[in-house]
Amino acid sequence: MPLKLTNTLTRRTETFSSLKPGEVSIYCCGVTVYDLCHLGHARSYIVWDVLRRYFIAQGYKVKFVQNFTDIDDKILARASKENCTMNEVSERNIEEFHRDMDALGILRPDRMPRATRCLEEIKSMIEELEKKGAAYSAEGDVYFAVMKHANYGKLSKRDLSEQQLNADGRVTDKEEARKQNPFDFALWKAAKEGEQSFPSPWGAGRPGWHIECSAMVLQELGETIDIHLGGADLIFPHHENEIAQSEVANGKKLAKYWLHNGMVNVGGQKMSKSLGNFTTIRALLKEGISAMTLRLFILQAHYRKPLDFTKESLDAASTGWKRLNVILCLGLMKHQTLNWPKPNIQESKITSLSKHSLNETLNLSRQQFIDALNNDINTSVAISILFELARPLRSLSNQIENGSSELISESDKHTSYSRWLLLTELANVLGLQAELPKTRTSKQSQNLDEVLIREAIQERKDAKLSGDFAKADKIREELNLKGVQLIDKKDGVTEWIQS
């Protein structure tokens, strides 16, 4: 089964075919850097990170470009509020963006252009649109005439009579009055008094939001690219306007495939800063929710569907991740006990999905995983396959933790290693990587009730002595879900560490 992707432009699920064999050019709309990112941003960048990882695993040479919008009304407003420059606001929040994305295990884009660094390209594109009669100036502003693009509305599938005026909320009443058509949009905005600005043939000002992305796509990837990515909230007007200005300026199709992820919802409403119902990535991580829990939470739903954010759904993802993480850590922590090769503890390299020769059962699991991602990047099904692969390894883990590793046959050790290796490689395609438990320190111990833990360990020991191994396993599992991992020593002593 070849890779199939749902193309917003055609509303069809299509077989993917790149413009150049073996290469993929991808542009992803980035953030406006005026504040910390929230879970909605995390969803976009995690799902597109998986798409990129999958292309790499399939042997493609990928060029992935993601921009920073560092010129915007929101940034200017924040700079005014904090009595600093627009650049200071942008630089600080770009650093914070990298901190969050790195924490989530998201691969850094190959290129991350900024609007402030491609102003000449932006102005050149506006001048080209003027030459073609698709742009006009009015009181220092420059607007794109939407009627000059014959297929305006082809992405959002709306005609102008159905469009909502000022859908992005970035246009003032005065700007509306200067337009020839209510749906024309700004390519260049004249500077207001005292506002940071940039020189241009039309006077001091700054570029409009949409033209920034069009210019950066052209600068970094060329006139036509394979895939353009973004959230569903960007379909109109942002991506619709990108298409219009790029295709008029360049005379060519902007992107072959348009992919859009669904929104994260809170109480039935889209998570957004404007509604005030957002939770930042930083806040979630500070609460002790692991980065991999957030990845699993996001990837358990299909990327195009809405994702409801609730405490219960996040707790369920946390429980699931802890179960999976124990198995992913197995080869990193117990390889000597199992006579497995010593693994590279550093971040795993994305490997080819057809690299290893496997037995029939494991080969089937690998193919099912590939088929799931080929089916419009169905990470929900792909994750279920990871848990299926992990299940037989759980009994192996239990035997080690119960101090009975000598009962594991050499044949089982060998077969289990192949299974574990495949599991880690497939998990890495989803960006799910083992989080090794931290060794317990006196400071960390203060966050856990050690008396209760010792009592639980003794209760487990008594259960094992009485032959009630089911109860012993249940106690160990309950402690594990609370972030406590038990280590049974050969002398009968059980130690614990905080994971």
From Swiss-Prot:
CDD domains: CysRS_core. It holds the Pfam family DALR_2. ATP binds at residue 273. It comes from Prochlorococcus marinus (strain SARG / CCMP1375 / SS120). GO terms for biological process: cysteinyl-tRNA aminoacylation. A motif ('KMSKS' region) lies at residues 270-274. This is Cysteine--tRNA ligase. SMART domains: DALR_2 (SM00840). A motif ('HIGH' region) lies at residues 31-41.
